[in-house]
A protein has these predicted regions:
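Conserved donor NDP-sugar-binding/catalytic core segment of glycosyltransferases
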Residues: 90-117
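Short beta-strand/loop segment that forms part of the nucleotide-sugar
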Residues: 6, 30-39
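Conserved nucleotide-sugar donor-binding
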Residues: 74-75, 138-148
């Protein structure tokens, strides 16, 4: 089982694009979705409410929001997902299947824009991540709860 933790602040224009694809996993009971909101002033919470399992309110600080979400989740495997990030469900299903073997990881980044400069940027972000075993939040970091 997987807990997907999504820190948000004023994401009402983007949040459904992130949450709707995850509903298949939620329906199959293979994940819980926790939204930790940083005191949004828009309709982010209202829009997200039907599509998440828990909504928590926190100060607006991504690391604090992620830690709060991790502290209340019920599963051992955590995935931190930015509210503006689309994720490949097949990749998520693969990490769920390998749950007991995973300590931490990240996905390769791919931008929606196909211009050369974005292809160049994603290539070097992914290369850096592979060479230095270093992922960023935009790459959907995942880890076991016990990982230090």
């Amino acid at each position: 089982m997987l807990s997907i933790i999504i820190p948000t602040k004023n994401e009402s224009k983007l949040i459904l694009k992130t949450l709707l694809p995850l509903q298949k996993l939620r329906k199959n009971k293979t994940c819980e979705i926790i939204l930790v909101d940083g005191n949004s002033s828009d309709s982010n919470i209202k829009i997200a409410k039907p599509y998440v399992d828990k909504i928590l309110i926190s100060q607006s600080d991504r690391s604090i929001q992620q830690n709060i979400g991790a502290s209340v989740c019920k599963n051992n495997l955590l995935l931190f997902l930015h509210a503006d990030t689309k994720i490949n469900l097949k990749d998520v299903e693969n990490i769920i299947l390998q749950n007991k073997k995973i300590t931490w990881g990240f996905f390769k980044i791919k931008f929606d824009n196909n211009k050369k400069r974005y292809r160049f940027l994603e290539f070097f972000i992914n290369l850096r991540s592979i060479l230095f075993k270093y992922g960023t939040g935009d790459q959907c970091l995942f880890m076991s709860k016990e990982f230090n």
